[in-house]
Swiss-Prot record:
This is Integrin beta-2. The gene is ITGB2. Mg(2+) binds at residues 136, 138, 234. PROSITE patterns: EGF_1 (PS00022), EGF_2 (PS01186), I_EGF_1 (PS00243), I_EGF_2 (PS52047). It comes from Sus scrofa (Pig). Integrin ITGAL/ITGB2 is a receptor for ICAM1, ICAM2, ICAM3 and ICAM4. Integrin ITGAL/ITGB2 is also a receptor for the secreted form of ubiquitin-like protein ISG15; the interaction is mediated by ITGAL. Integrins ITGAM/ITGB2 and ITGAX/ITGB2 are receptors for the iC3b fragment of the third complement component and for fibrinogen. Integrin ITGAX/ITGB2 recognizes the sequence G-P-R in fibrinogen alpha-chain. Integrin ITGAM/ITGB2 recognizes P1 and P2 peptides of fibrinogen gamma chain. Integrin ITGAM/ITGB2 is also a receptor for factor X. Integrin ITGAD/ITGB2 is a receptor for ICAM3 and VCAM1. It comes from the Eukaryota. Ca(2+) 1 binds at residues 138, 141-142, 264, 347. The modification Phosphoserine is found at residues 745, 756.
Length: 769
């Protein structure tokens, strides 16, 4: 299998080398060899003496290797340090699965250094297994079976490894509402059956430190009692965080670490603690006191990402042994937690041994190669060449599945620095395994120029030669240290080479020598850079037909401005000097309402090309010319006596021409119709007035007044008649109602209230005869 990988590794290496050689050199403000090396991985420096000519900057020494060779720099004079990787031989003794153990990298900015890491899975590697169990009431039958597992569990480990140890811990949930019932009686016995003996709820209890004594495991687990809580999710993530954060209390060795997490329900995570008024985020530290997580009610649950980071940091591989209904939930959790597995637990945990074996085989047959946190200036990628023939390139971490015992697999690691970095180190590890690779990183930014670096005569005995460039002594500057500063600082000298305080020295196109700009010679053919501050050139002008200033026949470029030859004009000399296309029939340029540019009228606002004759949006000054129309045509109105003086520039046209129609009143109240015909220029009009006017007779005042008075009187009489009729009808209706009431008031008997004025008395003694 190694033979199959070698050609692929060679191909990747060749492609990387070809890519590096084909890179361009984007140099900027380069004056030294170090500046050049930092400019990019494609840049190289020529240390040949007198390689740069008169007026050329030192930056011409910095270019791609191909360009430098083409310019006459021999290969021995080209300084081009490359990124390197040096591996240290593996230490003898011990069972090592990862090699090499130490690598030293010399990194040039932008250029990757590559090295190979080999992983060989060992047989019988030591294992520590910690069994973390949910003791909520629904796990009662599971606890009964786990109490019998001690010897079987350790025997199962010994089938896999020569050195196995087991430990035990349990969890329920935080002991505050709404997670558990906080009634004192329920806190003492949280089980639904009061006759059942249960232990008080707790967050996490470390029961048994990792041991190889199966009898001790069975004894300690046998003492455990079931507990209970209120809500369905459990506090399992709290317990896992403590198992990972307390290595000494748990007893972890530097071997393969397995954490079996057994539960039949989901889990609380960060933010759920707010339901119980717990706001402080989980700090990821160990808080075990007397083997109990007593600070559970002070810290929120950990987030899944926080737990994943802690497990990876502690090199712990979790195995989630969950019931059928929770398998999909925990499979999603394994997508976030690397090197984790899920197994379906039977309702009574009777298959836990088989589950652990299968999960371990699955975990140990897959290898992830990863590194610890790095600064932004370093980038690490992995190419994985697996034993099953599957390959992956440029991945953020190495990944191979189906790894077999004693069959090596190769990872190619590529490390790239974005700038010259400080010396530092980082660690590469295979997740779930204890072996690591320590990578020491050093910068590769210095130029090792082994030529006449001590020759001072080439620099006028006032400096030394370094990589083909003079490095002047204090008080001297210049390409050959020929300029003495005479006590002036470099800032003062450079100030006279700046156009203003905000500009760069010599516009970035020259060198400041003794306070004066010496402009560079351009690499562009026929381009000349000049000016006091090298701010001018003969190429930076507008172009016409792809040529600067339209070509030498049309114009020449002087300091960003085109100077046109005779017969041409325009910002790029693109126009012929002619106005023929701008003249109207009268020979007036743009009708006096625009300017002729490039033989085309540029009309004033509102007027339309081609000759600026029409202005659809302009307002017609009809009222302003009404008095002139009256005096010129009818010899009346306010201007009648001095019409020639007031309207001297306005002509009366004998016949109607195209123009704007106007209707205005004259001094006699008649309506005039006339046409305004615009002449060349602005506000210049001639008139054509219609012969007839429309005069309207004045109103008959007497008829209007008489009609108005008569109308008012008639309206008044009509209103009185209506009022009288309505009044009569109302009286008639009231009279009829009175008559009707009168008929209703006739009596059939005497009025009981009436008393007659005559009284008749009968004499009883009187005898009738």
């Amino acid at each position: 299998m190694l033979c199959r990988c070698s050609p692929l590794l060679l191909l990747v290496g060749l492609l990387t080398l070809r890519s590096a050689l084909s890179q361009e050199c984007a140099k900027y403000k380069v004056s030294t060899c170090r500046d050049c090396i930092e400019s990019g991985p494609g840049c190289a420096w020529c240390q040949k003496l007198n390689f740069s000519g008169q007026g050329e900057p030192d930056s011409v020494r910095c270019d791609t290797r191909e360009q430098l060779l083409a310019k006459g720099c021999v290969a021995d004079d080209i300084v081009d340090p490359r990124s390197l990787a040096e591996t240290q031989e593996d230490q003898a003794g011990g069972q090592k699965q990862l090699s090499p153990q130490k690598v030293t990298l010399y990194l040039r900015p932008g250029q990757a250094a590559t090295f190979n890491v080999t992983f060989r899975r060992a047989k019988g590697y030591p294992i520590d297994l910690y069994y973390l169990m949910d003791l909520s009431y629904s796990m009662l039958d599971d606890l009964i079976n786990v109490k019998k597992l001690g010897g079987d569990l350790l025997r199962a480990l010994n089938e896999i490894t020569e050195s196995g140890r087991i430990g035990f811990g349990s969890f329920v949930d935080k002991t505050v509402l709404p997670f558990v019932n906080t009634h004192p009686e329920k806190l003492r016995n949280p089980c639904p059956n009061k006759e059942k003996e249960c232990q008080a709820p707790f967050a996490f209890r470390h029961v048994l430190k990792l041991t190889d004594n199966s009898n001790q495991f069975q004894t300690e687990v046998g003492k455990q009692l079931i507990s209970g809580n209120l809500d369905a999710p459990e506090g399992g993530l709290d317990a896992m965080m403590q198992v990972a954060a307390c290595p000494e209390e748990i007893g972890w060795r530097n071997v393969t670490r397995l954490l079996v997490f057994a539960t039949d329900d989901g889990f609380h995570f960060a933010g759920d603690g707010k339901l119980g008024a717990i706001l402080t985020p989980n700090d990821g530290r160990c808080h075990l006191e007397d083997n109990l997580y007593k600070s559970s009610n002070e810290f929120d649950y950990p987030s899944v990402g926080q737990l994943a980071h802690k497990l990876a940091e502690s090199n712990i591989q979790p195995i989630f042994a969950v019931t059928k209904k929770m398998v999909k939930t925990y499979e999603k959790l394994t997508d976030i937690i690397p090197k984790s597995a899920v197994g379906e637990l039977s309702e009574d945990s009777s298959n836990v041994l088989e589950l652990i074996k299968n999960a371990y085989n699955k975990l140990s047959s897959r290898v992830f190669l990863d590194h610890n946190a790095l600064p932004d200036t370093l980038k690490v990628t992995y190419d994985s060449f697996c034993s099953n023939g599957v390959s992956q390139v440029n991945q953020p971490r190495g990944d191979c599945d189906g790894v077999q015992i004693n069959v090596p697999i190769t990872f190619q690691v590529k490390v790239t620095a974005s700038e010259c970095i400080q010396e530092q180190s980082f660690v590469i590890r295979a997740l779930g395994f204890t072996d690591t690779v320590t990578v020491r990183v050093l910068p590769q930014c210095e130029c090792r120029c082994g030529d006449s670096s001590k020759e001072r005569t080439l620099c006028g005995n006032k400096g030394s030669m370094e990589c083909g460039v003079c490095r002047c002594d204090a008080g001297y500057i210049g390409k050959h240290c020929e300029c003495q500063t005479q006590g002036r600082s470099s800032q003062e000298l450079e100030g006279s080479c700046r156009k203003d305080n905000s500009s760069i020295i010599c516009s970035g196109l020259g060198d400041c020598i003794c306070g004066q700009c010496v402009c560079h010679t351009s690499d562009v053919p026929n381009k000349k850079i000049y000016g006091q501050f090298c701010e001018c050139d003969n190429m930076n002008c507008e172009r016409f037909d792809g040529q600067v200033c339209g070509g030498e026949k049309r114009g020449l470029c002087f300091c960003s401005t085109c100077r046109c030859q005779e017969g041409f004009e325009g910002s790029a000399c693109q126009c012929l000097k002619s106005t023929q296309g701008c003249l109207n029939l009268q020979g007036v340029e743009c009708s006096g309402r625009g300017r002729c540019r490039c033989n085309v009228c540029q009309c004033d606002f509102g007027y339309q090309p081609p000759l600026c004759t029409d202005c659809p949006s302009c307002q017609v000054p009809c009222a302003r010319y009404a008095k002139c129309a009256e005096c010129l045509k009818f010899d009346t109105g306010p201007f009648a006596k001095n019409c020639s003086a007031e309207c001297g520039t306005t002509k009366l046209l004998p016949s109607r021409m195209s123009g704007r129609k106007c209707n205005e009143r004259d001094s006699e109240g008649c309506w005039m119709t006339y046409f305004l015909v615009q002449r060349d220029g602005r506000d210049n009009y001639d008139l054509h007035v219609e012969e007839t006017r429309e005069c309207v007779k004045g109103p008959n005042i007497a008829a209007i007044v008489g009609g108005t008075v008569g109308g008012v009187v008639l309206v008044g009489i009509f209103l009185l008649v209506i009022w009288k009729v309505l009044t009569h009808l109302s009286d008639l209706r009231e009279y009829k109602r009175f008559e009707k009431e009168k008929l209703k008031s006739q009596w059939n008997n005497d009025n009981p209230l009436f008393k007659s004025a005559t009284t008749t008395v009968m004499n009883p003694k009187f005898a009738e005869r």
